[in-house]
UniProtKB/Swiss-Prot annotation:
Pathway: Protein modification; protein ubiquitination. ARM repeats lie at residues 221-263, 265-307. Pfam families: U-box. This is U-box domain-containing protein 29. It comes from Arabidopsis thaliana (Mouse-ear cress).
């Protein structure tokens, strides 16, 4: 049923809205940065591995919440006054007409006219509203092919393509099925459209497009096909580049995609040639980038690339060993996962292959020996602790390392 024509729409004061969800806050809480969020929204943000304030991107010294009782009281007073003003009727706390979530019956009608930006936007609101809505659409066998046709059609406006990608990113249908649909006939038209969405879309559209690429990278064939598509790796290198406007969410999504496709040996060589290692070095050495997931995925991708000889040479030789410095810097500083990836990289460089002895000097100069001694006693896996022991056996024969053993770290000697 439609809304009554006399129904009143209320404009919500901006400071009553959560900066993340943009909805009226039900339980406002403030972080140590002073910014207030709805408790549920900020909890999801922090549970996702983030340790920064979403609004300011400042590193959080503590993740504790402080209930903003003053704001809660103001919201309650405002809400009560709105209710009294309208004699008990429930006001609509949303922008007028066209923003409400359509019903399932209305969606069934919308599916008959998908080549309309307005209709696609309504479906976006529908799938964003609940898990049951997403499941409802994902079970409609004809729905996904219709979205793929929108993306594939050359004359489709970019706005329609972006909305179709947004829906696909939300409903997460069967990977193999979607991959086969989008990459049929070498996937040319679909990949071209997704690249355009990455190039021309806003931040949200870029992230969604990258996630769809990641999702359809289903097997070795699809990973190679996507990686070899002109422009894909170029755009990914831009996405993980450190600039003033860099966004951690886009970097993380892009790294996840690169990790997925790097399982192919041919793709690893292409990533090395595209200077992915230089980009990773910049991420590791950027003090202001404190996102845990970004660091973990940067190190995981670097670990994968270190399996190739050209990758190891690039890591050791890049900017006089600065990449190795970045790896050592993250030991014990970010998370257990990050430490394990970092140790594996150093073990590969210094113990297994030892193609460049200068890397050992870089590890020692960066206080790597002391950190490795601590790793041995950490809660890292037994395999990683053994790698740390192997590394110390290699490094201990260097005279400068021996000096460290005899002075600062003798009390934690493993031998």
């Amino acid at each position: 049923m439609g809304r009554d024509e006399t129904e009143t729409y209320i404009t919500v004061p901006s400071f009553f809205k959560c900066p993340i969800s943009l909805d009226v806050m039900r339980s406002p809480v403030s972080l140590c940065t002073g910014v207030t969020y709805d408790r549920a929204s900020i909890q999801r943000w922090l549970d996702g591995g983030n340790n920064t304030c979403p609004a300011t991107m400042q590193l959080l010294k503590t993740k504790d919440f402080v209930p903003n009782l003053t704001l809660q009281r103001l919201i309650n007073i405002w809400s009560d006054s709105i209710g009294r003003r309208h004699n008990g009727d429930s006001p609509v706390l949303n922008p007028p007409s066209g923003r409400e979530v359509p019903t399932k019956e209305e969606v069934n009608v919308l599916l008959e006219r998908l080549m309309s930006l307005e209709n696609l936007m309504k479906i976006v609101r529908f799938v964003k509203d609940s898990d049951s809505n997403r499941e409802f659409l994902s079970k409609k066998m004809e729905f996904v092919p219709m979205l793929v046709d929108i993306i594939r059609t050359k004359k489709t406006k970019i706005e329609l393509v972006i909305m179709a990608i947004r829906i696909l990113d939300s409903i997460k249908v069967d990977r193999e099925r979607l991959s086969n649909l989008m990459l049929a006939n070498d996937g040319g038209d679909c990949l071209t459209a997704i690249l355009l969405a990455i190039q021309r879309g806003n931040l949200e559209s870029k992230i969604e497009s990258v996630r769809v690429l990641d999702w359809i990278s289903f097997d070795a064939k699809s990973k190679l096909m996507i990686a070899e598509r002109d422009g894909v790796l170029t755009e990914m290198m831009k996405s993980i580049s450190i600039t003033e406007s860099s966004d951690p969410s886009l970097i993380e999504a892009s790294l996840s995609f690169l990790i997925t496709i790097s399982k192919s040996k041919r793709v690893r060589s292409k990533l090395i040639a595209a200077k992915a290692i230089t980009k990773i070095k910049d991420i590791l050495l950027t003090e202001t980038l404190t996102n845990v997931a970004v660091t973990e995925k940067s190190l995981k991708l670097l670990e994968t690339l270190s399996s190739k000889r050209e990758g190891r040479l690039e890591i050791c030789g890049d900017d006089n060993g600065r990449c190795v410095e970045g790896v050592v810097k993250k030991l014990l500083k970010v998370s257990t996962t990050a430490t394990e990836h970092a140790v594996t990289i150093l073990w590969c460089l210094c113990y297994v292959f030892r193609e460049d002895k200068t890397v050992e000097e870089t590890v020692e100069r960066s206080n790597g020996v002391t950190k490795l001694l601590v790793v041995i006693q950490s809660n890292c896996s037994a395999m990683v602790r053994q790698m740390a022991k192997d590394l110390i056996k290699v490094l201990k024969f260097n005279s400068s390392a021996l000096a460290a053993y005899e002075t600062k770290t003798t009390h934690i000697m493993p031998f």
